[in-house]
Amino acid sequence: MSIFRSLSSFNISFKSNKSNDFNFNNYNGLVNQSSNELSRWNPKETVVFVKQGGKDRIAA
């Protein structure tokens, strides 16, 4: 699970043109869920939602 430990050290932030701040300071809390969820996690199936111009857009 070293990949999750390395991801937890990142501070990810995104600021849209609508001044909505997305700050994931506690990435470890988002990734560190139950061991079953971690074992089923597949990066190829991960979907990231980004709010742009007041509309939700999906970045795969």
From Swiss-Prot:
<protein>
    <recommendedName>
        <fullName>Putative uncharacterized protein DDB_G0280217</fullName>
    </recommendedName>
</protein>
